[in-house]
Amino acid sequence: MTPAPAPMYVPKFLMRQKLTMMVNQYEIYLANPDGSEGELMAFAQQKRMAFKEEVTFFSDRDKTRPVFSFKARKKIDLNAGYDVFDEGRQPIGSFRKDFGKSLLRSSWHLSAPGLEAFGQERNQSIALMRRLWDLIPVLGEVAVPFVFHFDFTDTIGGALVMSSERKKGIRDRYTIVVPDERVDFRLAASMAVALDALQSR
């Protein structure tokens, strides 16, 4: 029996991040057929110190209407993972970082109804260079110059379910492709933000 598609499925979207001393901002756009930014789908802004606990996404930059969110299960144990909620605070899915496997290559687990997926940095060499960069005291405070990507695959069968590709530029810009209809847009968007904001870069 084929699993039902997610309530809100978007096969491709774009994410733009803006970083300041006080807040992180993320703008998520529908991708046009030519790859350009289309409709604004969600906006998130959070104080940097609070970002690891809970993030709320809004329908516009004025933050007039919250539409989904993700929240840490335990504030003192981020290894416990994060739950993603819809506008009515109903769970959509979850994700968690695999800290053991992330020592050399950032690794995550993604869960949705009828789906368990595992994601890693695509390039092992880039992953190692990022870690060496972070070990140098001065350079560790400078934005990482390496372009890195993540791929998530179904733990049963190994099919690609989601990918996040970072683009070169002053700001962080990402293209997120979701081939698997079981992955809700709100879960994919939350995971995409987490890949940027919740790991040491």
Please provide the spans of the model-predicted regions.
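Intrinsically disordered, low-complexity proline/glycine-rich segments
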Residues: 1-201
